[in-house]
Protein backbone atom coordinates (compact mmCIF):
# COMPACT_ATOMS: atom_id res chain seq x y z
CA UNK A 1 0.00 0.00 0.00
CA UNK A 2 1.62 3.23 -1.20
CA UNK A 3 -0.39 5.73 0.85
CA UNK A 4 1.36 6.82 4.05
CA UNK A 5 -0.81 9.77 5.10
CA UNK A 6 -4.52 10.52 4.63
CA UNK A 7 -5.63 14.14 4.99
CA UNK A 8 -9.37 14.53 5.30
CA UNK A 9 -11.68 17.52 5.39
CA UNK A 10 -14.48 17.59 7.98
CA UNK A 11 -17.59 19.53 6.93
CA UNK A 12 -19.11 18.09 3.77
CA UNK A 13 -16.66 15.18 3.66
CA UNK A 14 -17.10 13.25 6.90
CA UNK A 15 -20.69 14.46 7.30
CA UNK A 16 -23.91 13.11 5.81
CA UNK A 17 -24.00 15.95 3.29
CA UNK A 18 -22.82 19.46 2.51
CA UNK A 19 -25.67 21.13 4.40
CA UNK A 20 -25.45 19.27 7.70
CA UNK A 21 -23.03 18.85 10.59
CA UNK A 22 -24.11 15.28 11.37
CA UNK A 23 -21.26 12.81 10.94
CA UNK A 24 -21.60 9.86 8.58
CA UNK A 25 -21.41 6.39 10.13
CA UNK A 26 -19.88 5.07 6.90
CA UNK A 27 -17.17 7.71 7.08
CA UNK A 28 -16.35 6.91 10.71
CA UNK A 29 -15.93 3.22 9.91
CA UNK A 30 -13.73 4.08 6.94
CA UNK A 31 -11.56 6.29 9.14
CA UNK A 32 -11.02 3.38 11.49
CA UNK A 33 -10.13 1.08 8.61
CA UNK A 34 -7.51 3.55 7.39
CA UNK A 35 -5.99 3.91 10.85
CA UNK A 36 -5.99 0.14 11.38
CA UNK A 37 -4.12 -0.23 8.10
CA UNK A 38 -1.31 1.93 9.46
CA UNK A 39 -2.14 5.12 7.58
CA UNK A 40 -1.51 8.35 9.46
CA UNK A 41 -4.77 10.31 9.37
CA UNK A 42 -4.77 14.11 9.56
CA UNK A 43 -7.92 16.21 9.95
CA UNK A 44 -7.84 19.31 7.72
CA UNK A 45 -10.58 21.81 8.43
CA UNK A 46 -11.57 25.44 8.13
CA UNK A 47 -12.60 25.34 11.78
CA UNK A 48 -10.59 26.88 14.60
CA UNK A 49 -7.88 24.84 16.29
CA UNK A 50 -9.61 24.26 19.63
CA UNK A 51 -12.76 22.99 17.93
CA UNK A 52 -10.75 20.89 15.48
CA UNK A 53 -8.72 19.24 18.23
CA UNK A 54 -11.88 18.40 20.15
CA UNK A 55 -13.51 16.78 17.14
CA UNK A 56 -10.28 14.99 16.24
CA UNK A 57 -10.08 13.44 19.70
CA UNK A 58 -13.46 11.79 19.21
CA UNK A 59 -12.43 10.62 15.75
CA UNK A 60 -9.26 9.00 17.05
CA UNK A 61 -7.05 11.50 15.18
CA UNK A 62 -4.04 13.25 16.73
CA UNK A 63 -2.85 15.56 13.96
CA UNK A 64 -4.82 18.55 12.71
CA UNK A 65 -4.62 21.23 10.04
CA UNK A 66 -6.87 24.06 11.24
CA UNK A 67 -8.02 27.46 9.98
CA UNK A 68 -7.62 26.39 6.35
CA UNK A 69 -3.90 25.71 6.73
CA UNK A 70 -2.91 28.62 8.96
CA UNK A 71 -2.25 26.31 11.92
CA UNK A 72 -0.89 22.75 12.06
CA UNK A 73 -0.97 20.61 15.20
CA UNK A 74 1.50 17.77 14.75
CA UNK A 75 2.70 15.31 17.41
CA UNK A 76 1.31 17.51 20.17
CA UNK A 77 2.92 20.76 18.98
CA UNK A 78 1.11 23.63 17.24
CA UNK A 79 2.86 25.45 14.39
CA UNK A 80 1.76 28.76 12.85
CA UNK A 81 2.20 28.88 9.08
CA UNK A 82 1.29 32.55 8.70
CA UNK A 83 1.47 35.76 10.70
CA UNK A 84 -0.24 39.09 11.15
CA UNK A 85 -2.91 40.82 13.21
CA UNK A 86 -6.39 40.22 11.84
CA UNK A 87 -8.19 42.66 14.16
CA UNK A 88 -8.22 45.54 11.67
CA UNK A 89 -9.21 43.18 8.87
CA UNK A 90 -12.13 41.97 10.97
CA UNK A 91 -13.30 45.54 11.57
CA UNK A 92 -13.07 46.32 7.87
CA UNK A 93 -14.98 43.17 6.91
CA UNK A 94 -17.79 43.86 9.36
CA UNK A 95 -18.03 47.50 8.27
CA UNK A 96 -19.23 46.34 4.84
CA UNK A 97 -22.47 45.01 6.31
CA UNK A 98 -22.48 42.01 3.95
CA UNK A 99 -21.60 39.41 6.61
CA UNK A 100 -21.94 38.71 10.30
CA UNK A 101 -19.20 37.09 12.40
CA UNK A 102 -19.06 33.41 13.27
CA UNK A 103 -19.21 32.59 16.97
CA UNK A 104 -15.85 30.82 16.48
CA UNK A 105 -13.96 34.01 15.66
CA UNK A 106 -13.09 34.72 19.27
CA UNK A 107 -11.11 31.47 19.20
CA UNK A 108 -9.57 31.94 15.74
CA UNK A 109 -6.24 33.60 15.00
CA UNK A 110 -5.67 34.06 11.26
CA UNK A 111 -8.58 32.59 9.29
CA UNK A 112 -11.77 34.44 10.24
CA UNK A 113 -15.21 33.04 9.46
CA UNK A 114 -18.37 34.94 8.57
CA UNK A 115 -21.99 34.18 7.74
CA UNK A 116 -23.06 35.86 4.48
CA UNK A 117 -25.96 38.30 4.53
CA UNK A 118 -25.91 38.89 0.78
CA UNK A 119 -25.34 36.62 -2.21
CA UNK A 120 -22.49 38.80 -3.44
CA UNK A 121 -20.69 38.85 -0.08
CA UNK A 122 -17.58 37.02 -1.33
CA UNK A 123 -17.14 39.34 -4.32
CA UNK A 124 -17.75 42.42 -2.17
CA UNK A 125 -15.14 41.40 0.41
CA UNK A 126 -12.59 40.59 -2.29
CA UNK A 127 -13.04 44.09 -3.70
CA UNK A 128 -12.62 45.68 -0.27
CA UNK A 129 -9.65 43.64 0.96
CA UNK A 130 -7.63 43.36 -2.23
CA UNK A 131 -4.96 40.79 -3.15
CA UNK A 132 -3.37 40.57 0.29
CA UNK A 133 -6.17 38.37 1.60
CA UNK A 134 -8.00 35.27 0.45
CA UNK A 135 -11.80 35.36 0.57
CA UNK A 136 -13.62 32.12 -0.21
CA UNK A 137 -16.63 30.08 0.78
CA UNK A 138 -16.54 26.59 2.27
CA UNK A 139 -20.27 26.16 1.76
CA UNK A 140 -20.71 26.56 5.50
CA UNK A 141 -19.15 30.02 5.93
CA UNK A 142 -17.09 32.69 4.20
CA UNK A 143 -13.42 32.61 5.22
CA UNK A 144 -10.90 35.46 5.20
CA UNK A 145 -7.18 34.87 5.78
CA UNK A 146 -3.78 36.21 4.68
CA UNK A 147 -2.85 35.30 1.10
CA UNK A 148 -0.24 32.62 0.51
CA UNK A 149 -1.52 29.95 2.88
CA UNK A 150 -4.16 27.27 2.44
CA UNK A 151 -4.67 23.58 3.10
CA UNK A 152 -2.30 22.83 0.23
CA UNK A 153 0.62 24.78 1.71
CA UNK A 154 -0.06 23.03 5.01
CA UNK A 155 0.03 19.61 3.35
CA UNK A 156 3.35 20.44 1.65
CA UNK A 157 4.75 21.62 4.99
CA UNK A 158 3.50 18.39 6.56
CA UNK A 159 5.21 16.30 3.89
CA UNK A 160 8.53 18.03 4.52
CA UNK A 161 8.17 17.67 8.26
CA UNK A 162 7.32 13.96 8.07
CA UNK A 163 9.73 13.17 5.25
CA UNK A 164 6.93 11.76 3.10
CA UNK A 165 6.66 12.52 -0.63
CA UNK A 166 3.46 14.37 -1.50
CA UNK A 167 2.43 11.60 -3.91
CA UNK A 168 2.23 9.25 -0.93
CA UNK A 169 -0.31 11.54 0.72
CA UNK A 170 -3.99 11.14 -0.15
CA UNK A 171 -6.55 13.83 0.58
CA UNK A 172 -10.33 13.90 0.44
CA UNK A 173 -12.44 17.05 0.25
CA UNK A 174 -15.58 18.66 -1.09
CA UNK A 175 -15.26 22.42 -1.39
CA UNK A 176 -13.27 25.31 -2.81
CA UNK A 177 -11.20 25.59 0.37
CA UNK A 178 -9.94 22.04 -0.30
CA UNK A 179 -8.58 22.82 -3.76
CA UNK A 180 -5.03 23.45 -2.53
CA UNK A 181 -4.63 20.13 -0.74
CA UNK A 182 -6.37 18.19 -3.52
CA UNK A 183 -3.90 19.69 -6.00
CA UNK A 184 -0.66 18.91 -4.15
CA UNK A 185 -1.54 15.36 -3.04
CA UNK A 186 -3.39 12.34 -4.43
CA UNK A 187 -6.68 14.16 -4.22
CA UNK A 188 -10.15 12.65 -4.04
CA UNK A 189 -13.27 14.78 -4.44
CA UNK A 190 -16.54 13.39 -3.14
CA UNK A 191 -19.43 13.08 -5.58
CA UNK A 192 -21.22 16.24 -4.45
CA UNK A 193 -18.08 18.40 -4.33
CA UNK A 194 -17.90 21.83 -5.92
CA UNK A 195 -16.74 22.07 -9.55
CA UNK A 196 -13.42 23.59 -8.43
CA UNK A 197 -12.74 20.72 -6.02
CA UNK A 198 -13.58 18.13 -8.67
CA UNK A 199 -11.27 19.82 -11.16
CA UNK A 200 -8.38 19.84 -8.68
CA UNK A 201 -8.75 16.19 -7.66
CA UNK A 202 -7.14 13.20 -9.36
CA UNK A 203 -10.20 11.07 -8.62
CA UNK A 204 -13.87 12.00 -8.27
CA UNK A 205 -15.80 9.26 -6.48
CA UNK A 206 -19.49 8.65 -7.06
CA UNK A 207 -20.84 8.85 -3.51
CA UNK A 208 -21.60 12.13 -1.76
CA UNK A 209 -19.83 13.35 1.38
CA UNK A 210 -19.34 10.53 3.92
CA UNK A 211 -20.24 7.77 1.48
CA UNK A 212 -17.80 9.22 -1.01
CA UNK A 213 -15.11 9.31 1.66
CA UNK A 214 -15.71 5.62 2.29
CA UNK A 215 -15.29 4.94 -1.42
CA UNK A 216 -12.02 6.90 -1.45
CA UNK A 217 -10.66 4.88 1.48
CA UNK A 218 -11.59 1.65 -0.29
CA UNK A 219 -9.59 2.75 -3.34
CA UNK A 220 -6.63 3.73 -1.14
CA UNK A 221 -6.63 0.43 0.76
CA UNK A 222 -6.85 -1.54 -2.48
CA UNK A 223 -3.65 0.11 -3.69
CA UNK A 224 -5.36 2.25 -6.30
CA UNK A 225 -3.87 5.55 -5.17
CA UNK A 226 -0.60 7.28 -4.26
CA UNK A 227 1.46 5.90 -7.14
CA UNK A 228 4.40 8.09 -8.30
Swiss-Prot record:
Mg(2+) binds at residues 9, 11, 174, 178. Disulfide bonds: none annotated. GO terms for cellular component: cytosol. GO terms for molecular function: magnesium ion binding; phosphatase activity; phosphoglycolate phosphatase activity. The active site is at residue 9. Its EC number is 3.1.3.18. Substrate binds at residue 151. This is Phosphoglycolate phosphatase. It comes from Pyrobaculum aerophilum (strain ATCC 51768 / DSM 7523 / JCM 9630 / CIP 104966 / NBRC 100827 / IM2).
